[in-house]
Regions:
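Extreme N-terminal, non-catalytic leader segments
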Residues: 1-45
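P-loop/Walker-type NTP enzyme "switch/lid" segment
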Residues: 34, 39, 43-49, 63-139, ...
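Hydrophobic positions on the alpha1 helix immediately C-terminal to the Walker A/P-loop
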Residues: 53-54
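Active-site signature of alpha/beta-hydrolase-fold catalytic machinery across serine-
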Residues: 57, 61
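Conserved catalytic-core segment of NTP-binding enzymes
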Residues: 65, 70, 142-168
């Protein structure tokens, strides 16, 4: 017995692409709080996975779309995101071009020796950087180090979204 199959084919309208819902993937979105920037933490304990590069590309893309972006660099040892942004600022100045720049804050680890004092110091440093950023920007991109640090774990508690780049 033959069963007729009917399919409705529609021509997509330019600029209206919407991905098909995938019921096998639980899709959640952190609720937007008016006047508070969305905090995206980019983390992976592995070094060289592309965290800083991903942070820069996401920030530039969001700024190109008109969003106000803040970036925080928690990798005091390497400071790759900070160096990327310093190079971008130097290029803008040298070439006289108008490119968007995020509000950027490097957040160094504590230099205190006593563990509980160092952890309290790092919490204060992170909050001092994050609180004004979430109030001033639409998005706050947090680049974490390629290691397990107290500062990195604290940043994860602030995340509205987590992104973990993988690189074999």
């Amino acid at each position: 017995m033959s069963v007729p199959v009917s399919a409705q084919v529609s021509t997509p309208v330019s600029g209206s692409f919407q991905p098909a819902p995938n019921p096998s993937i639980a899709q959640t979105q952190a609720p937007r709080v008016a006047g508070r920037g969305h905090v995206l933490v980019i983390g992976n304990e592995k070094g060289g996975s592309g965290k800083s590069t991903t942070a820069l590309h996401i920030a530039v893309s969001l700024m190109s779309d008109g969003a106000k972006v803040a970036t925080l660099d928690l990798d005091a040892r390497q400071g790759t995101l900070t160096r990327y942004l310093e190079n971008r600022a130097a290029y803008i100045k040298r070439k006289g071009v108008d490119l968007p720049m995020p509000m950027h804050t490097p957040v160094p680890i504590s230099t205190l020796n006593e563990r509980s004092a160092a952890e309290a110091d790092e919490r204060a440093r992170l909050e001092a950087a994050l609180e004004p950023a979430v109030g001033a920007a639409d998005f706050v991109i947090v680049d974490t180090p390629g290691s397990d640090t107290h500062l990195s774990r604290l940043a994860h508690t602030w995340a509205d979204s987590l992104l973990t780049p993988l690189n074999d």
